[in-house]
Swiss-Prot record:
Name of the encoding gene: hemL
Self-association and partners: Homodimer.
Species for this entry: Polaromonas sp. (strain JS666 / ATCC BAA-500)
Annotated NCBIfam families: hemL, PRK00062.1
UniProt key word Transferase: no
N6-(pyridoxal phosphate)lysine found at: K282
Name the UniProt record assigns to this protein: Glutamate-1-semialdehyde 2,1-aminomutase
Keywords: Cytoplasm, Isomerase, Porphyrin biosynthesis, Pyridoxal phosphate
Gene Ontology MF term list: glutamate-1-semialdehyde 2,1-aminomutase activity; pyridoxal phosphate binding; transaminase activity
One term under GO cellular component: cytoplasm
Cofactor requirement: pyridoxal 5'-phosphate
Location relative to the cell: Cytoplasm
Domain of life: Bacteria
Catalytic activity as recorded in UniProt: (S)-4-amino-5-oxopentanoate = 5-aminolevulinate
Length: 442
């Protein structure tokens, strides 16, 4: 639906500014998640008052084409009629029970049916909770303590995962946040993404002690960096060889890049490819607080109440969240959904690239399904160190120019973007036109 009575964008941000000042007095940094504060790009955060389709309106009634989509969940756009109807119906039956519901079973059935590697799942309330629980389960199932993660991959803010690489190859990591004791991360080995030699050495040195290797198959907190096919294949082979579990963090990519997640994309190039465990979130909740982790029956049956690995949650499987998630999953299974979504997203990236190239501005981008990223670089990076070479001040200028044109990208250089089925060809054209004007004057 095309909104009517759109106000022109103006530099005045009276209500946004006032709300931010009020918030800073009571909420640390004025926000409830750091990236929202615009600290990386400067300026005043936009306080959203409503959203519909591909758009949101801020507190000053300025409209924006939204390429964040709640950081990925809104694959259908905001306020999709079928999802809204499902949530409204669920609300009439009660908000939360602390007891099992039929919708929990239905959602689990859908997830297991759609993701071939899943035999059982456990529902939780956030991606952080899912990743944290998956690691605990991997350790419990294998009887091992050490885990592998990769520099630049984000798996939530659990203590054991807030870690950066140590001082040498195949050394254990150091905390990236105050409040995380060094001993908490002493079992976390941090490797360079897409670095085969480091991967080989880590398993050669520690293979018998490694419980799991956790990886974002497409790293969305490096903007958009794919694990190469040879690298992913070797991850699978080494985990199998040493008895470690391969854990796919698909909180961002699950149902966002393909119906079966990123693992289904890799399975096209690696015959029989499956992770042992998968972490899901975002799209499966349709914008509600809902996530999941799952895997083989043998591993998942180690969870309480069947097994010795404890995990619990008061709001896990919330009836309103599961209604929202089920409605979303049903919509994205309609014929042609991902073909159209992928085509629209590729069109956006191609348009931005062409506009930058025409102006002689270094630029490259990539996408899969409804997820995309771009860099002010000459070629796509393969690891975090290369991502860090992107021109930060230039990105900040781009961000604010697009914002002034009514286009809302992530207010940080290292975050992926998202296209929804609600984005129209006109939205993409308007976005590319705004970018072309910026690049021409850069």
């Amino acid at each position: 639906m095309e909104p009517q009575n759109i106000k022109p964008h103006t530099p005045e941000l009276s209500r946004n500014t006032a709300l931010f000042e009020r918030a800073k007095k009571l909420i640390p940094g004025g926000v409830n998640s750091p990236v929202r504060a615009f600290k990386a790009v400067g300026g005043t955060p936009r306080f959203v008052q409503r959203a519909q389709g591909a758009y949101f309106w801020d507190a000053d009634d300025q409209r924006y084409i939204d390429y964040i989509g709640s950081w990925g969940p809104m694959i259908l756009g905001h306020g999709h009629p079928a999802v809204l109807a499902s949530v409204q119906k669920a609300l009439l039956d009660g908000f939360s029970y602390g007891a099992p519901t039929e919708r929990e079973v239905e959602l689990a059935e859908e997830l297991v049916r759609l993701v071939p590697s899943l035999e059982m799942v456990r529902l939780v309330s956030s991606g952080t909770e899912a990743a944290m629980s998956a690691i605990r389960l991997a350790r419990g199932a294998t009887g091992r303590s050490k885990i592998i993660k990769f520099e630049g991959c984000y798996h939530g803010h659990a203590d054991a995962l807030l870690v950066k690489a140590g001082s040498g190859l195949a050394t254990f990591g150091n905390p990236t946040s105050a409040g995380v004791p060094p001993e908490v991360v002493q079992h976390t080995l941090v490797l360079e993404y897409n670095h085969l030699a480091q991967l080989e050495e880590a398993f050669a040195l520690h293979g018998s002690a490694i419980a799991c290797l956790m990886i974002e198959p497409i790293a969305g907190n490096m903007n958009f960096v794919r694990a190469s096919i040879p690298f992913m294949q070797r991850c699978r082979e080494l985990c199998t060889q040493y008895g470690a579990l391969l854990v796919f963090d698909e909180v961002m990519t699950g149902f966002r890049v393909a119906l079966g997640g990123a693992q289904s994309v890799y399975a096209k190039s690696i015959p029989g490819f499956k992770p042992d465990m998968t972490v899901l979130g975002k799209v499966i909740g349709g914008g509600m607080p809902l996530a999941a982790f799952g895997g083989t029956r043998a591993v998942m049956e180690q969870l309480a109440p069947l097994g010795p690995v404890y995990q619990a949650g008061t709001l896990s499987g919330n009836p309103v969240a599961t209604a929202c998630g089920l409605a979303t999953l049903r919509e994205i299974q309609k014929p042609g959904f991902y073909e159209a979504l992928g085509e629209r997203t590729r069109g956006l990236v191609a348009g931005l690239t062409q506009a930058a190239n025409k102006a002689g501005v270094p630029f490259c981008g990539d996408s899969e399904g409804g997820m995309f990223g771009f860099f002010l670089l000459g070629q796509l990076p393969q690891n975090y160190a290369t991502v860090m070479t992107t021109d930060g001040p230039a990105f900040n200028r781009f961000f604010h120019a697009m914002l002034a044109s009514g286009v809302y990208y992530a207010p940080a250089l290292y975050e992926a973007g998202f296209v929804s089925s609600a984005h129209s060809a006109a939205d993409i054209e308007a976005t590319v036109d705004a970018a072309a004007k910026f690049f021409a004057g850069a």
